[in-house]
Amino acid sequence: HQGPLYKRKGFAMKENKFQADLKKELKSRFPGCIVTKLDSADIQGIPDLLVLYKDKWAALEVKKSATASHRPNQDYYVEKMDNMSFSKFIYPENKEEVLDELHQAFES
């Protein structure tokens, strides 16, 4: 067994597959949370996902890999929304770290 396909060396999982799996994992880790997609056609650079949990929220910009390029305004909105609450770029290589940080933020 080689582990999840997106963790295999040399294989870059498509962003939409990683995002779909991530949404399921968020709902499992944070029971009762709402995970919804934000519309970058409305605000260019807005993060992909909004996570609502109890009285907290987080925004996650999903990338297929650590080296995937950032679109215009993404850095601005991730930083701005992180200052408001919690926002990060998330990709397979840092997923566990970001989800652990998110857990700490949601439980604080």
Residue ranges and their predicted role:
Residues 1-108:
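Catalytic phosphate/metal-binding cores of nucleic-acid and nucleotide-processing enzymes, i.e., regions
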